[in-house]
């Protein structure tokens, strides 16, 4: 991404982009999100699917809450985490909503 975009955003909304990124490249997703947000900015993510083993391939690539914590807690602060109660039926119980803040 162009340097002029670095630090220009208060919020990034994640919805089904992360699950399309190969697990071997998710560190790049983390890096780009970090670059785009200004200090205090928020990455608001609805991460999916939590119940799909990586061995099944993708996309969508599976992810666990533990993996999300491992990736993002290195640089971010987790402000909130919840399981959505009003998901559509095919995704109910298979996604997590997380609010990550850039210090």
Residue ranges and their predicted role:
Residues 10:
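Conserved acidic residues
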């Amino acid at each position: 991404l162009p340097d002029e975009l670095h630090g220009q955003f208060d919020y990034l909304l994640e919805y089904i982009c992360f699950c399309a990124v190969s697990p071997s490249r998710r560190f790049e997703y983390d890096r780009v999100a970090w670059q785009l947000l200004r200090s205090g900015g928020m990455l608001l993510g609805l991460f999916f699917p939590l119940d799909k083993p990586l061995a099944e391939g993708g996309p969508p690539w599976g992810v666990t809450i533990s993996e999300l914590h491992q990736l993002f807690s290195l640089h971010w602060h987790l402000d909130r985490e919840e399981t959505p109660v009003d998901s559509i039926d095919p995704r109910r119980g298979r996604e997590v909503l997380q609010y990550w803040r850039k210090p």
